[in-house]
Amino acid sequence: MQPHLFTPLTIGSVTLRNRIGMSPMCQYSAVDGFPTDWHLMHLGARAAGGVGLIILEATAVSPEGRISPFDLGIWSDDHIAALSRIVKLIESLGAVAGIQLAHAGRKASVGRPWEGGKPIAPANGGWPVVGPTAEPFAPGYPTPIPLDAAGIARVVADFATATKRARAAGFRWIEIHAAHGYLLHNFLSPLGNDRNDEYGGDLRGRVRLLSEVTAAVRAEWPSDLPLAVRLSCSDWTPEGLTIADTVEVARMLREQGVDLIDCSSGGIAPGITIPVGEGYQVPFAAQVRREANIATAAVGLITRPEHADAIVRNGDADLVLLGRELLRDPHWPLRAARALGHDLAPPPQYLRAW
């Protein structure tokens, strides 16, 4: 019997060749938002390795929305041609090309991780950061400028325009980044948002910005193309977002035309203990799928083919996203297929190795 991990997944008009996706992972190798040869090598290698979906790293909808000065961007029409080259490469190798649209909010303007990852002051090439309030992410981080009504409207418009550019570049899958303490999660979590206007307060108020962004993106994105949202399903503290909150948010997003929830967690504040272990976020994907009646992706320390196959077979998630495991092994899907007794053809140039 064919392993469940290697069955196709169809959402709208898009069919993935299997249930394995590459999670968006920043490479900190862009120049002025433009991809470089590193991105072509990095993304092309994983497409050749057999994944069904590749989601480009957090791609900023505005210059100030970048995590670092070295992040991909989609804030200018000038970015379209370079991104289109990546799309064509990925799709020529049998994978579907997706993109994660993002705004880093108060966690923006930091250096590369391997260079310390510290905040960069505007005088040194950084930029002012924004958030729901003036509360910085952590000691030593800059004080955000609280977004007013005009600032919020700009963010929503930036996501909408970025969506148009993503379509022009040929992407067939969009993911809105609303996790890991970045702008949309910062608004969504009670740990990051104590506003007393219509964008704060209870969950309905805190979800408003994400809802407005989702509506703007869905309006510009063809109805037959998949739209996903990455959520931090838990802040891992009772004072923060809970899985019950996330189920409610997922129901709202489903009503807005979102097709899939990418179930991650954490990132809203430092110093919170996360019980990391194999598949530690899979229960979130299972609960959201079951209680919100929406497709989900499982992500986080999924490394064994048998485990990944069981996630799909058991109905815990519709899609398995791999991150660091694909950094370690670009050909993980080919190896997983062999381990599960499935014949997944490598590129013909590599046949002699398989």
Swiss-Prot record:
Cofactor(s) required, per the database record: FMN
Alphabetical list of InterPro entries matching this protein: Aldolase_TIM, OxRdtase_FMN_N, YqjM-like
Gene3D superfamilies: Aldolase class I (3.20.20.70)
Entry keyword annotation includes Nucleotide-binding: no
Binding locations of FMN: S23, P24, C26, A58, Q100, R230, L301, G323, R324
An annotated Gene Ontology molecular function: NADPH dehydrogenase activity
pH note: Optimum pH is 6.0-9.0.
Catalytic reaction equation(s): A + NADPH + H(+) = AH2 + NADP(+)
Enzyme Commission code(s) on record: 1.6.99.1
Active-site residues from the entry: Y182
Keywords on record: Flavoprotein, FMN, NADP, Oxidoreductase
UniProt temperature dependence: Highly thermoresistant.
A Pfam family it matches: Oxidored_FMN
The protein's assembly and partners: Homodimer. Behaves as an active monomer in solution while in the crystal packing assembles following the classical dimeric architecture of other thermophilic-like ene-reductases.
Additional note from the record: Is a robust biocatalyst showing high thermostability, good solvent tolerance and a wide range of pH optimum.
Role according to the record: Ene-reductase that catalyzes the stereoselective reduction of activated C-C double bonds. Shows very good activity with 4-ketoisophorone, 2-cyclohexen-1-one and 1-octen-3-one, and low activity with maleimide, 2-methyl-pentenal, 2-methyl-cyclohexen-1-one, 2-cyclopenten-1-one and trans-2-hexen-1-al. Shows the highest catalytic efficiency with ketoisophorone. Exhibits a restricted substrate spectrum with generally lower activities compared to other ene-reductases.
Family statement drawn from the similarity comment of this UniProt entry: Belongs to the NADH:flavin oxidoreductase/NADH oxidase family. NamA subfamily.
Protein name: NADPH dehydrogenase
Species of the source: Chloroflexus aggregans (strain MD-66 / DSM 9485)
